[in-house]
C-alpha cells in the first residue's frame, strides 16, 4: 500500500492534533553492539594514522614530539567520538495515531566553538593568501574557503520527525536492549517503520503496555537479538519481491 502526499499530510495533522498519552526522553547512539563499534572506531581514528610516525620516524619515548603525537591521537579520538559518532537526544511524544519526536546530536558546546573558531582562522588564511598571491590563491584553496564560510554558522540542529501507527502494528522488542523497532506488514512506507530508544528497560516496558492498550491490532514479538527480527515474514516477502 502506497501513501500519497495528501494522505501523509492528513496523517501528520491527525498525529499532532491527537492527545499526548506519554512522553519520554532518551540519549542514545544505537544498540549495544553499535556502542562497541564506536569505541573501536574512535580509538582507530586517533591511533592508526599517527602511530606509524612514532615507530618509523625514530621518535624518542617521552620526548616533546612523542607527547605531541599523543595529543594529536587524543584529539583525533575525541573528534571521532563527539563530532562524527555522537549520541542523539530524542524527545518522544506518544499519541493514539503514532509518535512525533525531535532528534538532536549531542555534541559538546566546546566542539561548536572550536569549529567556528577554526573556520574564522581558515577565512583569515584565505584572505592573507589572496593578498599575497592574488586571485590564483583560490585555485587551490577555493574549496577550503567555501567550507570555512559554511562552518562559521556551525550550530546544533534539531530535526522534527514522525512515525505513524498502521492498522496492523508490529513491535519488535530485543529484550536486552533499551530500544524497540516498530514495523507493519500493511505497507513498506518508511513513515511506519522506526527504531525508538529508551532510558531504561522499565520505561520501554511501560511504553509497550501503553501501545497495546491504545492499539487494537498489535503483534508483540520479543527477541533475543536485534537481528532476529529479519527472520519475520515481512522481510522475507520483501526479499522475494526483489
Swiss-Prot record:
It is a multi-pass membrane protein. It is found in: Host membrane. The keyword Ribosomal protein does not apply. Its main location: host cell. One of its GO terms (cellular component) is host cell membrane. It comes from the Bacteria. The chain crosses the membrane at residues 39-59, 66-86, 118-138. Disruption phenotype: Deletion mutant is susceptible to killing by V52 strain in a VasX-dependent manner. The keyword Transmembrane helix applies. Keywords: Host membrane, Membrane, Transmembrane, Transmembrane helix. Immunity protein that plays a role in preventing early activation of toxin VasX. This is Immunity protein TsiV2. The lineage of its organism: Bacteria, Pseudomonadati, Pseudomonadota, Gammaproteobacteria, Vibrionales.
